[in-house]
């Protein structure tokens, strides 16, 4: 079994005075978790494998602030950083990579213009491009867009529909088919968030995570729903995720990265020191 990664996710809101890490349920009811650079330093010191920064403001004005946050973080931490949120152009990707990001995650732009994935991976390399899939279960399995049926946590059959704009707009695209397309277009990794689970702390959506992992050969990062370190174990053992993303359980001090890794190691999951 390959070494599994633990990745704290920092959802950042940006203002004229800098950035603030926040966390909510399904991207609403946001609660402040602190300064992004300070949190990043803490996770670096605790042994996180990577960091993900998501600019949830995603405004033109905020982009310069995000670049400043990434530049300051890059001078303090020495683990790979992935940055996303509202990225629409090759120029934005270039600026963020120059600021110190190692990878870029794209979501809505990729759905609206799939060839953007190919263009970005051709220019920067597929290892730099992480495509995020936000999806939500849809129990209307007779929908003509329903290409793959997956069982939900409650046992009911459903297909998973890609959603964009932070989960506000359904697309009619089957998430498993979209994952295959993403891989074909050159994305190096998938970051999968089930909106059914996001922010609930009831655990990752294991069924769709496992189904997408089985449909593609590129790594899949499980995201959305971590409430305990046992949920991370489930993501690795049951869903066979390559990495587990978590936010609030780390931000608010419920667990440290070290505690998560010790627990996983004791249960036979290979993790880095």
From Swiss-Prot:
GO molecular function, one term: lyase activity
Pathway: Amino-acid biosynthesis; L-histidine biosynthesis; L-histidine from 5-phospho-alpha-D-ribose 1-diphosphate: step 5/9
Localization (cell): Cytoplasm
A GO BP entry: L-histidine biosynthetic process
GO cellular component: cytoplasm
E.C. designation(s): 4.3.2.10
Reactions this protein catalyses: 5-[(5-phospho-1-deoxy-D-ribulos-1-ylimino)methylamino]-1-(5-phospho-beta-D-ribosyl)imidazole-4-carboxamide + L-glutamine = D-erythro-1-(imidazol-4-yl)glycerol 3-phosphate + 5-amino-1-(5-phospho-beta-D-ribosyl)imidazole-4-carboxamide + L-glutamate + H(+)
Active-site residue list: 11, 134
EC top class named in words: lyase
Complexes and interactors: Heterodimer of HisH and HisF.
Designated name of the protein: Imidazole glycerol phosphate synthase subunit HisF
Name of the encoding gene: hisF
